C-alpha cells in the first residue's frame, strides 16, 4: 500500500507496507488509528528495520518480507527466481504464510530476526550498492585517460561479470586475483602514486590483503604489500604537513 490515506483496510489477509523505511513506523501508527481487524497481518518490506517498526500494531500479526534483490526500476517477476527473501513474523502462522509466499514467487525464504537485521542489511549494501560505487570509480579513472563513460562501462562490465562468475564457482577467497593476491607491492605502489583519491583503493586493498592471506599468499609478500600500503599513508601525511 502507498503512503496515503483514504483507503479501506481489508478484513483479513496480508497488508504490505511498500513505503520508504522512514515512513514505516508513521504508517503503522496511522493504520493502528484505523482499528485494523485482528485477523489482518501487516508486513513491511524493509531490509533494515525489525518488527519493532510495527510496534503500534501490536494487536495484529506483524511481519517483514525483504527480497534480497536490487529493484532500481520495475522488474519482471522472474527477478525473484532463486533469490533469498528475508522473512520474520510475530506469529508462527504469519511466518508460514510469508515462507509460502516466498516459495510461490520462486524465491528461498530465510528467517532473519531483529538481532540480525542491521548486519544483514549492511551485507546487502556491500554486495549491491558498493559494487556500483566501485564500478563508478573505475569508470571515472578511465574517463580521466580519455575514455567516454559508455566506452569505459562497456569495457569494464565483462570484467565485473567474470569476477562474479569466479565467485560463484570458487567462493570469494579463492576467486581473488590481481596484484594484491600476487603480493605485487611494486604495482600497488605505482597505483597509489597515480591515483588522485588513493584512500578508497588503500582501504579496499587492505581488506583484499586479508583475503589473499587466507588464500595462501606468502607471508613475506603479504608483509611487503602491507608496508607499501601503509608507507604511502605516512608519506602522504608528511607531505600534507609541509
What are these regions, as identified by a protein language model?
Residues 49, 55, 151-160, 210-218:
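Membrane-interacting alpha-helical segments
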Residues 1, 59, 76-169:
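Internal alpha-helical scaffold of NAD(P)-dependent oxidoreductase catalytic cores
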Residues 165-221:
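Interdomain hinge/lid region at the active-site interface
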Residues 155-159, 204-207, 224-228:
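Short acidic/histidine-centered micro-motifs embedded in hydrophobic/aromatic stretches
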Residues 22-23, 49, 92-93, 133, ...:
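Short alpha-helical
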Residues 216-242:
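NAD(P)-dependent dehydrogenase/reductase Rossmann-like domain
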Residues 2-76:
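Rossmann-like NAD(P)(H) cofactor-binding subdomain of soluble oxidoreductases
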Amino acid at each position: 500500500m502507498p503512503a496515503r490515506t483514504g483507503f479501506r483496510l481489508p478484513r483479513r489477509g496480508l497488508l504490505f507496507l511498500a513505503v520508504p523505511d522512514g515512513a514505516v513506523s508513521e504508517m503503522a501508527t496511522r493504520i493502528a488509528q484505523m482499528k485494523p481487524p485482528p485477523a489482518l497481518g501487516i508486513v513491511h518490506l524493509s531490509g533494515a528495520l525489525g518488527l519493532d517498526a510495527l510496534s503500534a500494531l501490536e494487536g495484529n500479526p506483524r511481519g517483514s518480507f525483504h527480497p534480497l534483490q536490487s529493484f532500481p526500476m520495475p522488474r519482471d517477476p522472474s527477478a525473484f527466481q532463486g533469490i533469498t527473501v528475508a522473512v520474520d513474523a510475530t506469529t508462527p502462522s504469519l511466518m508460514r504464510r510469508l515462507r509460502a509466499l516466498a516459495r510461490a514467487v520462486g524465491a528461498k525464504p530465510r528467517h532473519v530476526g531483529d538481532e540480525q537485521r542491521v548486519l544483514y542489511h549492511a551485507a546487502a549494501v556491500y554486495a549491491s550498492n558498493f559494487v556500483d560505487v566501485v564500478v563508478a570509480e573505475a569508470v571515472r579513472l578511465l574517463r580521466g585517460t580519455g575514455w567516454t563513460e559508455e566506452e569505459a562501462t562497456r569495457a569494464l562490465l565483462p570484467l565485473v561479470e567474470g569476477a562474479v562468475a569466479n565467485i560463484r564457482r570458487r567462493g570469494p577467497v579463492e576467486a581473488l586475483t590481481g596484484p594484491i593476491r600476487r603480493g605485487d607491492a611494486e604495482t600497488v605502489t605505482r597505483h597509489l602514486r597515480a591515483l588522485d583519491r588513493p584512500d578508497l583503493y588503500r582501504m579496499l586493498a587492505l581488506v583484499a590483503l586479508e583475503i589473499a592471506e587466507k588464500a595462501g599468499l606468502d607471508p613475506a609478500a603479504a608483509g611487503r604489500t602491507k608496508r607499501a600500503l601503509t608507507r604511502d599513508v605516512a608519506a602522504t601525511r608528511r607531505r600534507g604537513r609541509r
